[in-house]
């Protein structure tokens, strides 16, 4: 680095290639701080050593112990190296993104970035690509090993390109997840932990739901594409067993309603939509630090889109039976046992769809519901501007209407899913009750409104306690009670029925009359479901009435006992807003 | 300079006759900031013309930092309008940020960057030309705050005062037209403070408007061309130090008079004069409060001499600005004496 007359200041600030290729100040800031030679050399050497080991060990074993042909032996290290790349990008990269942005918030230097005239999008991109720059270089160090294995292993580009495209898009998605976690969580250590937990949940645990009909979730991971191309990566000499070959070759394309898409294309598309949502969250936060993560309309749109994706991926697989776990198991083990989908698994899948929809609904309610302070601020602003009420899409407005709209959409999606499954050829002897739609909507509406009203009126802490004591404790206690004896199954079913978590499964069991199950299942669960849903609906109505009373009281406490807005509307005493006052709600 | 203040509406304007037609550098209308039930800034209106060094004074919790954070586009108020150099900061935040230089209280610096790297990050964000041009500007700013020799060291190795100076250099980088400095002198040694004062005066002379808060009030009084006192979210008074003192009803000072003979008679005579209160007698020394002008004070002394009193000393003692602020903070926040001012 050349020195100018000023000690320590270089004559120009573009000492490296990475500094120059993208003129984003935040990116360049991290290129400087995270690529300092001392630390970088250590990390790159470490990566080189591990990658070398993972490359040479399986290759040598295959070549000298397995006596494989050279082209086959060269293929052996590919998955090991890919695993290392995944660890570097997914775990180290994401953790550093989350911790890095929280560190800035912790130090207080994030405010400087808020003050800079860069657009929110440039800031987001700067952090997204700058914070994990060292991990991307470490990834680059492993690429020669991959390139060698692909070249000498004679793996064609159409095999490895989709896999690496999805690997990179997954990494970007995970980094965005880390960035969101780091931006939302205030504590540096928690940000790291939360980002890792969110990633494990989003991209490891939740995708397991794909095995039970929620196929969309698997497209958030690398697995579908890897599954699709697994066989071409494996050495030809170990593709032996016929059922393994059929398992690996007989893969359907990604189905979205009537469309057949390559797995890679649909995966990248699915991840892009989620990435866009994360970018929207970050954009809102950079634009206004106090803003909700998502606006109300965006949340409603996202919810509808998720329903569309869940249905679009699942419905085309019903006819062939590929949606059902029994068929998947049969395929995996090459056996014919349990090849026919069972009504029990259909009920479980319908219940799970309802539960996932309910969880998504509650997550979005948590995002869009204003805190009491926000509501008061919104009222004050409205009063100042002489408005009749807070604009309905502003962050400060009640989320009651949007909760109801999302519950309605979720109920419709859930009903369509259940109708398509039960109405399929696999379950000819079964029929969905006529009032399934309204009941499903009621289940989601009851849980959603209770959650929303408690959150809006009493805050997150009260909601947390309610969730623990009404959502979790009854399920756990009922589970333990059910283990005692057969006689205790009935009280256990009643107890578990208190929890909204069990409601979707109880609803599925109630709406699809079945035979062949014992009395607990066929009699107790529907009765318990009707009773507890009745209680839930009454509670929801009562809470909504209370919330509206609280809204009125709050409006009067903020605006005074006289309703200025009514007067304003009638023209008797219109408060004139000072010129130039703007709303930014 | 004229000062106007409406006690109820918390409206203040500082008007400099030299620039009557200029667009105010800082224009705040009906600004309110709430934190839950706590009103941090209560319907404040304020107008500061270009070239002023405007001090914002008040005890902790007065609402200074909240006001500064709103001005710096870091916080959204409950409502209100803010224009900096004619730019609405809520409508055009990116444009507003080009004219703002903000230095927060206890200004932090990143631990993983060197001094020049820290400055280059913001020089580039503000689009200050090519690499060499930016480096030249960084050199200028570091020279201005006497940190040039530290440009190659990591920010985390700087002392508190050096960190403050570095952040000041960062604030000055893009030649902002409105400087918002929250406690800029905290942690600085006396020499650095003097440099800061000089730097701010030079900037103001070049047309920049500076709004600054400090707990070192005497220093603020020296530095600022005008002051404004804030307490419990409301603006109380504005003007020069003396004008503010007067506006706050603290224009009176303590006079001590040394009289050789007939001290009791002199006390009786003082008791009959206007503007005189709280007379106490200790031997030959008469101590009393006087709220009149200096001319009236001279007339008082002349009258005493004409009555034949032998005066050998006259000492004047003004209450310090700190004392006034302590009183303001403890006593409440209304100023009954000033006439209401119509809002623009």
Predicted region positions:
Chain B
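C-terminal coupling/interaction segments
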Residues: 11, 16, 292-344
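Extreme N-terminus of proteins, especially the signal/transit-peptide cleavage junction
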Residues: 16-24
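ABC transporter nucleotide-binding domains
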Residues: 23-26, 33-212, 217-231, 236-237
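ABC transporter nucleotide-binding domain
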Residues: 197-291
């Amino acid at each position: 680095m050349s020195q100018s007359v000023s000690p320590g200041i270089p004559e120009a600030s573009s000492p490296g290639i990475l500094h120059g290729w993208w003129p984003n100040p935040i990116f360049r800031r991290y290129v400087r701080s995270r690529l300092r030679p001392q630390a970088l050399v250590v990390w790159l050497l470490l990566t080189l050593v591990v990658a070398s080991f993972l490359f040479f060990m399986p290759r040598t074993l295959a070549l000298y112990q397995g006596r494989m042909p050279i082209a086959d032996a060269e293929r052996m290290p590919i998955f090991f190296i890919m695993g290392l790349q995944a660890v570097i990008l997914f775990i180290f990269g994401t953790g550093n993104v989350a911790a890095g942005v929280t560190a800035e918030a912790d130090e207080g230097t994030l405010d400087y970035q808020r003050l800079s005239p860069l657009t929110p999008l440039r800031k987001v991109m700067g952090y997204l690509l700058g914070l994990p720059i060292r991990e991307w270089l470490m990834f680059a160090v492993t690429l020669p090993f991959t390139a060698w294995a692909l070249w000498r292993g004679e793996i064609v580009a159409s095999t490895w390109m989709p896999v690496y495209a999805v690997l990179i898009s997954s990494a970007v998605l995970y980094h965005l997840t880390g960035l969101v976690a780091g931006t939302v969580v205030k504590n540096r250590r928690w940000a790291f932990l939360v980002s890792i937990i969110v990633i494990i949940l989003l991209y490891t645990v939740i995708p397991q739901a794909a095995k039970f009909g929620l196929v969309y979730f698997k497209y958030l991971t690398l697995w579908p594409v890897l599954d699709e191309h697994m066989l071409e990566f494996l050495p030809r000499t170990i593709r032996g067993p016929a059922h393994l070959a059929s398992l690996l070759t007989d893969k359907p394309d990604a189905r979205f309603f009537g469309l057949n898409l390559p797995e890679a294309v649909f995966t990248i598309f699915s991840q892009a939509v989620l990435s866009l949502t994360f970018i929207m969250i970050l954009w809102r936060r950079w634009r206004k630090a106090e803003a909700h993560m998502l606006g109300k309309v965006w949340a409603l749109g996202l919810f509808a889109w998720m329903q569309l994706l869940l249905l679009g991926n699942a419905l085309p697989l019903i006819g062939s039976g590929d949606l059902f776990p029994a068929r998947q198991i049969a395929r995996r083990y090459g056996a014919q046992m349990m090849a026919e989908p069972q009504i029990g698994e259909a009920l479980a899948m319908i219940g799970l769809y309802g539960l996932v929809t309910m969880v998504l609904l509650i997550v979005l309610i948590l995002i869009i519901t204003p805190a009491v302070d926000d509501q008061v601020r919104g009222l004050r602003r409205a009063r100042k501007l002489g408005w009749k009420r807070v604009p309905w899409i502003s962050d400060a407005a009640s989320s009651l209407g949007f909760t109801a709209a999302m519950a309605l959409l979720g109920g419709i999606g859930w009903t369509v899913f259940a109708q398509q499954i039960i109405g399929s050829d696999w379950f000819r002897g079964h029929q969905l009750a006529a009032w399934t739609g309204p009941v499903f909507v009621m289940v989601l509406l009851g849980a959603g409104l209770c959650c929303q009203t408690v959150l809006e009126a009493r805050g997150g802490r009260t909601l947390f306690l309610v969730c623990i004591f009404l959502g979790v404790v009854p399920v756990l206690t009922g589970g333990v009670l059910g283990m005692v004896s057969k006689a205790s199954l009935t009280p256990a079913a009643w107890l578990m029925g208190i929890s909204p978590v069990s409601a979707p499964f109880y609803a599925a069991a109630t709406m699809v009359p079945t035979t062949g199950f014992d009395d607990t299942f066929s009699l107790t669960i529907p009765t318990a479901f009707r009773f507890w849903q009745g209680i839930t609906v009454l509670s929801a109505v009562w809470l909504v009435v209370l919330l509206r009373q609280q809204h009125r009281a709050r409006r009067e406490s903020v605006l005074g006992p006289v309703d200025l807005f009514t007067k304003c509307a009638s023209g008797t005493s219109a408060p004139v807003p000072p010129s130039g006052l703007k709303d930014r709600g | 300079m004229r000062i106007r203040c409406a006690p109820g509406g918390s409206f203040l304007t500082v008007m400099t006759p030299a620039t009557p037609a200029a667009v105010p550098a800082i224009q705040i209308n009906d600004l309110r900031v709430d934190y839950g039930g706590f009103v941090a800034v209560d319907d404040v209106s304020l107008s500061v013309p270009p070239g002023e060094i405007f001090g914002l004074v008040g005890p902790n919790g007065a609402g200074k930092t909240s006001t500064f954070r709103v001005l710096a586009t870091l916080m959204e108020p409950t409502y209100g309008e803010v224009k900096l150099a004619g730019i609405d900061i809520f409508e055009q935040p990116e444009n507003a940020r080009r004219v703002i230089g903000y230095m927060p209280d206890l200004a932090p610096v990143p631990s993983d960057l060197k001094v020049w790297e820290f400055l280059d990050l913001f020089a580039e964000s503000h689009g200050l030309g090519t690499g060499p041009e930016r480096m030249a500007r960084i050199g200028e700013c570091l020279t201005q705050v006497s940190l040039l020799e530290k440009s190659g060291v990591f920010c985390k190795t700087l002392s508190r005062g050096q960190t403050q100076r570095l952040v000041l250099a960062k604030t000055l980088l893009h030649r902002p037209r409105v400087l918002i400095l929250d406690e800029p002198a905290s942690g600085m040694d006396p020499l650095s403070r003097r440099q800061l004062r000089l730097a701010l005066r030079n900037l103001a002379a070049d047309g920049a408007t500076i709004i600054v808060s400090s707990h070192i009030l005497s220093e603020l009084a020296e530095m600022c061309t005008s002051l404004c006192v804030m307490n419990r979210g409301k603006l109380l008074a504005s003007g020069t130090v003396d004008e503010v003192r007067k506006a706050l009803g603290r224009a009176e000072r303590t006079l001590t008079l040394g009289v050789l003979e007939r001290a009791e008679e002199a006390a009786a005579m003082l008791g009959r004069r206007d503007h005189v209160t709280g007379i106490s007698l200790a031997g030959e020394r008469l101590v009393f409060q006087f709220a009149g002008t200096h001319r009236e004070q001279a007339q008082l002394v002349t009258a005493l001499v004409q009555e034949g009193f032998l005066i050998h000393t006259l000492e004047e003692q003004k209450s310090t600005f700190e004392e006034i602020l302590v009183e303001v903070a403890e006593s409440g926040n209304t100023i009954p004496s000033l006439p209401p001012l119509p809002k623009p």
